[in-house]
């Protein structure tokens, strides 16, 4: 059974450089992963690298803590979609969830 098409190949390190992101995309194409998941600043690069490959570009929003406003998360998500993301992984604001404000 092949599980590669269920994997989100991810690189979220703040020190990641463009060549590492390009390598992430190459690996996703080589192994047939479902998507690459990156910080929103790398969405345009991934969208270009993965054009016509069938591999989705996923952007994290509110990463890593989730402790930002809903407006800021919505803006980051909208920008990522405009830049080529077809999936969004949002980090919840744990304090708000714990207090029932979600």
Place the predicted regions along the sequence by residue.
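Generic N-terminal amphipathic, Lys/Arg-enriched alpha-helix
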Residues: 1-29
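Hydrophobic faces of well-ordered beta-strands that scaffold small-molecule active sites
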Residues: 3-11, 36-38, 56-62, 88-90
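Conserved, mostly hydrophobic/aromatic
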Residues: 8, 46, 80
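Active-site-adjacent beta->alpha loops and helix N-cap segments on the catalytic face
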Residues: 18-19, 37-56, 67-72, 95-102
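Generic structural signal for well-ordered alpha-helices
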Residues: 21, 25, 43-44, 77-78
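Short active-site oxyanion
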Residues: 29-36
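Glycine/small-residue-rich loop that forms an oxyanion/phosphate-binding "nest" at active or ligand-binding sites
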Residues: 57-99
């Amino acid at each position: 059974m092949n599980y590669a098409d269920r994997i989100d190949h991810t690189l979220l390190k703040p020190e990641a450089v463009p060549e590492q992101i390009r390598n992430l995309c190459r690996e996703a194409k080589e192994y047939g992963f479902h998507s690459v998941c990156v910080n929103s600043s790398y969405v345009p690069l991934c969208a270009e690298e993965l054009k016509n490959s069938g591999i989705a570009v996923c952007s994290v929003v509110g990463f890593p803590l989730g402790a930002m406003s809903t407006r800021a998360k919505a803006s980051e998500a909208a920008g990522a979609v405009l830049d080529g993301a077809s999936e969004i992984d949002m980090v919840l604001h744990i304090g708000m969830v714990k207090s029932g404000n979600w």
